[in-house]
Amino acid sequence: MMVKKLLIVKIGVVSDTHDDIENTKKAINIFNTMKVDYVLHAGDYIFPGMISLFKKLNKDTKFYGVRGNNDGELMGITRQFDEIENAQFLNEFGKLLISSKNIAIYHGTNSDLSESLKESQLFDILILGHTHIKRIEKMGKTLVLNPGPLNRNFFSKNTNDGPCVIIYDEKRELAEFININSTQNIK
């Protein structure tokens, strides 16, 4: 009898990059250092050219993203995704099966839809953006992840709180914020 072994994965989550090239490069460096298998972007790239930065992800990292409410140039976004190996643009809403996890990605523009997705319990992981509020919360069986905005202009310079990504480690069954300006949490 042959037993099929499930791949244990690490997933990087980012959202609301809002044209911040420097912070996006820092996030990509964290994803590469932590050897994530997937990067999921919950939208609001703004300028489609921002997507091309994700070409710097490790060769085997798969990149998926959805459209945010500030992402108006749909053709440009689609073209940028098409130019990246192992990348796919999922338009406004995406459903993925990664390892054994049913994952939904939605920017969060419609708060009623966001709440319905949370309450539906159809997904193991729900990735949102839009609100610029960081969140890692278990709601029933669904792990809700929102890394908050990556753009530095959404944070006070007088606070330790800053731009973050989320790393979900399936092996440890743990999701955690990684502040892009602090390398102490990178393992």
Language-model segment annotations:
Residues 5-8, 95, 118-122, 140, ...:
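Binuclear metal-dependent phosphoesterase catalytic core
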Residues 62-111:
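Helix-adjacent hinge/juxtasegments
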Residues 13-15, 39-44, 63-69, 105-107, ...:
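Active-site neighborhood of phospho(di)ester-bond hydrolases with catalytic His/Asp-centered motifs
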Residues 53-66, 142:
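Short acidic, glycine/proline-enriched helix-loop-strand junctions
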